[in-house]
Amino acid sequence: MRRVDLGPCAGLLHENDPDRCVVVLPGMRYTTQAPLLWFAREVAATRGWSALEVLDSLPEGDDPFGWARDRARRALDRAEADEVVVIGKSLASAAAGLVADRVLPAVWLTPLLDRPRVVDDLSRAARPALLIGGSADEVWVPDALADSGLLQVVQLDGLDHSLQRPGHPGASLDALRAVATRIDRFLDELG
């Protein structure tokens, strides 16, 4: 792996198949080193995909949605593979419009479905998108989505915005395994 320059931040490139790359986008307080994104990247690596992680956190005072879209744009501009899949957590879903415009498949972990713009942008997906959220997450509002036929919605009962069950580490680990398994199936279905 090697560090790459993304302008205002760095990226970490894990090199495997140069023709296939997952772009891993952090949330506002959820870095690419946190469990969901770490294991999403690991799943992709076992399938031979390269991965480009955005190594950044929201600077104090910045517009969070503008920050998320900017970092996504910079990472996508840097990804040189023929096949690119976006994997993003929470605030990263602010870039769903950019992903739709670039006709890319995506995995959105706990997307902000309480935000009309995010919902509208997700509904414009031109390639398959996997959305995973927990029923105990206030921003998880899957009924807000229009059924485009390309959105695969997975709801995990009793899980919060971190896709954890507070006070139950074993159940949280089971959830992490379920998320990794579902991401693996999604990548397999893409071919």
Q: How would you describe each model-predicted region?
A:
Residues R2-D82, R165:
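Serine-hydrolase catalytic machinery in alpha/beta-hydrolase-like enzymes
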Residues W140-L156:
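Conserved loop-alpha-helix segment in the C-terminal half of the alpha/beta-hydrolase fold
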Residues L159-A175:
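Catalytic histidine-centered segment of alpha/beta-hydrolase-like enzymes
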Residues R102-P116, P128:
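A conserved short beta-strand
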Residues V84-G97:
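Gly/Ala-rich beta-loop-alpha elbow adjacent to hydrolase catalytic centers
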